[in-house]
Amino acid sequence: MNNFRWFWFFIKSRINWILWILFLNIILLGVAYIDYEISVESVFYIVILNVGLSILFLLFTFVKEVRLSKHFYEDKEIEEIKHKDLAETPFQQQVIDYLYRHIAAQKEKVVEQQLQIKNHEQTITEFVHDIKTPVTAMKLLIDQENDDQRKRALLFEWSRINEMLDKQLYLTRLETHHRDMYFDYISLKRMVIDEIQVTRHISQAKGIGFELDFKDEQKVYTDVKWCRMMIRQVLSNSLKYSDNSTINLSGYNIEGHVVLKIKDYGRGISKRDLPRIFDRGFTSTTDRNDTASSGMGLYLVQSVKEQLGIEVKVDSIVGKGTTFYFIFPQQNEIIERMSKVTRLSF
């Protein structure tokens, strides 16, 4: 904001005083004009001097008081404003003291809440890691099961438990995921195959197969752990809402970007629900009896995609299936985005 606009705001804030001074000077001229014993010319000179000195006083006051307003406008910290002692009037000092006390109290509350959240996240993380041990042991026991039908049923439920634990772990790490990323060129086909292996017990139990169409040399510049998490959430949704069908996964290039396409032939998503599928906790409005979904999987995808620079698009037709597109960035785009984040952090 330029100085002229600041001066205009200052004048508007002092308009009552300015009008009062002008009113008094007009009264003085009027009295001199009515009373013949008073020299109008002398009074006029006094009025001119009075107005001139008032203008100088306004300019002097503006220069002193505008500094505080500029610091507020520039969102300076209240500690900096108080340290510089910018208050020019007792009223301004009262305002600064009030803001300082209340902002300091709010900051203490924020720090306390952040500590509570951190402790809560640490507790959940430790719980998930602790429960992973018996879950892993359970897998070893299931592998020793001789009854194939019973074994498949147990592996199906074990896979669901393992997936829910992983999802909870990712949700807990979500606030600090930007500090837990390492970008490198990764084989897209390898990541997809690894995630299919993780979900194979669920797909086998539901009679779902996979068709892959990738080039071996097709690589993407990303963080392998968080990218695999995104792929897993979409695959999990496709498996959850499909039966006895096929999921097509393919990779292709378009305008210099690698695109991962995941297409299922499940129940699909209605147009009404499509804009909301990435909202936290959102579940389908078409089947209110469905309790299988927590509404957190695609929320994870939405929360991480920006840090990875991945654009996600969705097409769906109810009763015919859903298609997800992951459009991966180029390396220079990731570096540029990370440099912007670094500059903002300083």
From Swiss-Prot:
Residues modified as Phosphohistidine are 129
Query: Where is this chain's protein located in or outside the cell?
Result: Cell membrane
Q: Give start and end of each Histidine kinase domain.
A: 126-332
Q: What is its main location?
A: membrane
Q: What is the recorded membrane topology of this protein?
A: Multi-pass membrane protein
* Gene Ontology annotations of biological process type: cellular response to phosphate starvation; response to antibiotic
Q: Does the keyword Transmembrane apply?
A: yes
Q: Name one GO cellular component term.
A: plasma membrane
EC primary class: transferase
Q: Report keywords, A-Z.
A: Antibiotic resistance, ATP-binding, Cell membrane, Kinase, Membrane, Nucleotide-binding, Phosphoprotein, Transferase, Transmembrane, Transmembrane helix, Two-component regulatory system, Virulence
Tell me, what's a Pfam family for it? HATPase_c
Name of the protein in its database record: Sensor histidine kinase GraS
Question: To which species is this protein native?
Answer: Staphylococcus epidermidis (strain ATCC 35984 / DSM 28319 / BCRC 17069 / CCUG 31568 / BM 3577 / RP62A)
